[in-house]
Amino acid sequence: MSGSGVLLLTLLLLVPLSALAKECSMYYCSGGDFCCPGLKCGDPTGKKICIEPGK
């Protein structure tokens, strides 16, 4: 694979990740950590849920 092909592939992978990270940073766990909607905030008991600021 040429260098430009690798670069293009890397960019294609990074764009969705950064978009996802941006969306996730708009939400936070009850513990204060950023998270994505629908995730359990890394709490095995599932008590901490992901909430949108201002709600």
From Swiss-Prot:
Tissue localization of expression: Expressed by the venom duct.
Recorded GO MF terms: toxin activity
Cellular component GO terms held in the UniProt record: extracellular region
Keywords annotated in UniProt: Disulfide bond, Knottin, Neurotoxin, Secreted, Signal, Toxin
Domain of life: Eukaryota
Disulfide bonds listed in the record: 24-36, 29-41, 35-50
Major subcellular location class: secreted
Position of the signal peptide: 1-21
Subcellular location: Secreted
Cited function: Probable neurotoxin.
Comment block on domains: The cysteine framework is VI/VII (C-C-CC-C-C). The presence of a 'disulfide through disulfide knot' structurally defines this protein as a knottin.
Name this polypeptide is given: Conotoxin Cal6.40
Organism per entry: Californiconus californicus
